[in-house]
Every structure is written in C-alpha cells, then in structure tokens.
Amino acid sequence: CYLSRKLTALYPEVVALDLTKPEIDAPGITAVQGDVTGLRFADNAFDTVFCTEVLEHVPPEKLQQACNEIVRVASRYAVIGVPYRQDLRDNRTRCLRCGAVNPTTGHLNRFDRQRLTALFPGMTPREIRLTGRGQAVTNPLSVAIYRLCGYPYGSYEQEEGCIRCGEKLVRPKIDRIQWALCFVARALNQIQY
C-alpha cells in the first residue's frame, strides 16, 4: 500500500495487485485481487510494472510464467525487486502438522544478476542495483544442526503457512540439549563473518 500511494505522485492511475485484494482506499488507486502467474490485463496495459517482494514467493515451476506475464503487460518498463543471492538455508521452519521443511519467510527462489536477467527475455536491463550481503549467512554444519533440532529458530512469525499443507507455522519447543546445539550453530554462523 505504501508503494502504491507513493506512485500516485508519478502516475495518475495506479493498480495495486496482491493475492488478496489490498485494503487501500485512495484517489487514483484501484485495488485488485490477482496472481502474477495469470494477470487479467491486456497486453501492454501498463506503462510501468512494479513487482517488489513477489517473485521470491512464486513456486519455482511457475516463476518463468510470472515473469512472462510481467513482460506481457508492461508497455515500457518493469521495476523488479528481489532479495540478492539470499541464503535460503537460513531461518528455515518445520511444520509441526505435516513435517515439511519451509524456506525462510516463504522465499522459494534465489536470484543473482544473471538469473534475474534471464527470466525477462526481450527486456534489456536499464539499471541494476544490488542490495543485501549477497553471501552465505550460514554453513553446512549449522544447517545440519538446525535440521537435527527441528529448525527451532526459523522465521515462524511469517504470514505464509506451510508450503505443503497450509497450516500456520508454530515454533517448536526444544529441550536443553537442542538449545545448546543451536547455540553452537549460531556461534558458528557468527564466527564465519
């Protein structure tokens, strides 16, 4: 909603789209429920498409389809915002209901400059800005310890439910041995930087 409001200073008409209809009531903004993998807009419907904090959540098998849709509806520009080289092993969660391991904050995809450019055939990047560390924030030993302990320090406060069953993610209880092991794993992560 914040970005939509800011964009009204640049564009007379703004369409705010999300999986659930955005709760925004402001002049010049039309709120729409939709899915980036199947946009219900005509070809070249928008001068500029802003797609931020979205593509990392799209299932990998639908990612190219989502990018093709952005290219299809953008008549001039597409502004894309994704985490740069995010370490998807960090902050995983485990669903207590079905046992599925979930990625951090529902992020299913990892991007670097080459991959992001390849996802948008026919578009030439005008500018690329990289933010974030762009390096691993964990290591294989820490990942193995977290997995053994059931990922107790994952991103359980995220909005997204389990990627397999949809259940709300709940932080597991851990005993003293698990706590000590996770303490060691966190320390290993800290000393690598």
Which residues does each PLM region occupy?
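S-adenosyl-L-methionine-dependent methyltransferase catalytic module, highlighting the catalytic core
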Residues: 31, 37, 59-193
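Conserved SAM-binding loop
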Residues: 1-90
